[in-house]
Regions:
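Short, surface-exposed basic-aromatic patches at helix termini and helix-loop junctions that form
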Residues: 249-258
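Hydrophobic "anchor" residues on beta-strands that sit immediately upstream
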Residues: 158, 236, 259
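Hydrophobic alpha-helical scaffolding
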Residues: 32-39, 67-73, 85, 212, ...
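Short amphipathic alpha-helical "interface-anchor" segments enriched in bulky aromatics
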Residues: 49, 95, 349-381
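A short acidic (Asp/Glu
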Residues: 170, 245-250, 271-275
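An anionic, glycine-rich sequence signature occurring as long contiguous blocks
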Residues: 2-4, 9-26, 259-367
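Dynamic "connector" segments at or just before major functional cores
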Residues: 1-210, 214-229, 254
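Acidic/histidine-rich, metal-coordinating catalytic segments
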Residues: 162, 233-243
Length: 383
């Protein structure tokens, strides 16, 4: 006997796509026998509120058009662009295909019977109309949204910063060849919350690693804004050696609320300082190999040692605390350095905290899953 599933009530069908807010005062009833079908019904779930981040971004773009002739507001167009990306239409050139889709219309606040959404030409004009001041306001909006996501000020915030490649395949502005990735690309800077995994700020940058001075200016603005919102919160920067800039360390030295935990590139002076501990670790590794039995594998033998030292580079104003990790295995000797403002915890604890920044690579992958690295626009200022 087969169970009859064709007589599902309308109330059961409505519960699958219930919305907290109707579209232009009209309730949405989901049925599967209407002539106007859409495969993008999930957009109605994504439209949980009118005051979304894309809506706020659209309101930040100055509109110099003759308003009596405007048929598509910038707020609606930005929402349309974002929702199209969710549906798999990543380029502005794709606007002509889904512009008449009923679900896409309702996701931006229109009725299915209303006129179609904007075309490719209109969307392209919007993207080319964005200037640097607007991009700055949008970047500030991201940080403001991050602050508003907390019900109360946190005691401690970790800023995980890193850049990644966004490959380009045309004549885009500021696209450069990156030898590490062996590709022509942009190098966006991404800042995440290391605890809550929230995206704080994305920023598109040229296709090479940014100079430390430019990165320091960006980080300082973010930290200063967070401190204005949360005066009693400790803000800690965590990143690789690229973010170990003397400008940021010198600025943060007298700020009690700013800490940093970044990688440090090794040099001959640092290697000379840890030479004796390195030799002791290598001797311990040899002794461990001698104790192995015939069935044991030497690949399982790893010797790790952690040390702290005070070090001052020639360009630094102040002496910094440096953590050295010496790892000896069958693959050889690996020495890593980390510079920090934290002088309370043990060297091993500090280095373990630094290693947690590796989780950020997974968060960057999640961002790329939503086509954030799609670089189809010729102008670098185009969203």
């Amino acid at each position: 006997m087969c169970k009859n599933t064709t007589n599902n009530s309308v109330e059961q069908q409505k519960s699958l796509f219930s919305l907290p807010e109707p579209v232009l005062g009209k309730k949405i009833k989901v049925v599967f026998n209407a002539p106007d079908m859409s495969s993008n019904g999930g957009l109605l779930l994504a439209r949980s509120s009118k005051d979304t981040l894309p809506s706020k971004m659209g309101r930040l773009i100055p509109d110099d058009r003759t308003q009596c002739l405007v048929r598509h507001s910038y707020e609606e167009m930005v929402c349309q662009r974002v929702n199209q990306i969710l549906c798999g239409y990543e380029d502005a050139n794709d606007c002509d295909r889904p512009r008449c889709d009923s679900a896409l219309k309702m996701s931006v606040g229109r009725r299915p019977s209303d006129e179609d959404l904007c075309s490719q030409a209109t969307m392209t004009r919007l993207e080319n109309n964005v200037d640097s001041k607007t991009l700055y306001r949008i970047g500030k909006l991201f940080v403001e949204q991050y602050v508003k996501s907390f019900s109360k000020p946190p005691r401690h915030v970790i800023l995980d910063a890193d850049d990644t490649n966004a490959n380009t395949y045309g004549a885009q502005q500021l696209t450069l060849f990156n030898a590490y990735y062996n590709e022509y690309c942009h190098m966006p800077l991404l800042i995440f919350d290391g605890v809550s995994k929230k995206l704080i700020l994305p920023m598109l940058r040229p296709g090479r690693r940014n100079k430390s001075l430019n990165v320091s200016r960006i980080l300082r603005r973010v930290v200063e804004y967070l401190h204005e919102c949360w005066p009693n919160t400790v803000i800690e920067l965590r990143g690789d050696s690229h973010f170990c800039s003397r400008e940021f360390m010198d600025w943060a030295w007298s700020k009690w609320y700013v800490r940093y935990l970044t990688g440090l590139s090794g040099n001959t002076k640092l290697l000379d300082i840890v030479d004796k501990p390195r030799r002791r670790a290598e001797n311990d590794f040899k002794k461990a190999l001698e104790k192995l039995h015939g069935s044991d594998s030497k690949d399982n033998v790893v010797i790790r040692r952690y040390f702290k030292l005070d070090y001052k580079a020639q360009s630094w104003k102040h002496e910094q605390r440096v953590i050295a990790k010496i790892e000896v295995s069958a693959k050889g000797t690996n020495i890593r350095f980390v510079v920090t403002k934290n002088r309370n915890n043990s060297p091993k604890t500090i280095y373990k905290r630094y290693c947690k920044r590796g989780e950020m690579e997974l968060w960057i992958k999640d961002v790329k899953y939503f086509k954030a690295d799609r670089m189809s626009c010729a102008k670098v200022r185009s969203p």
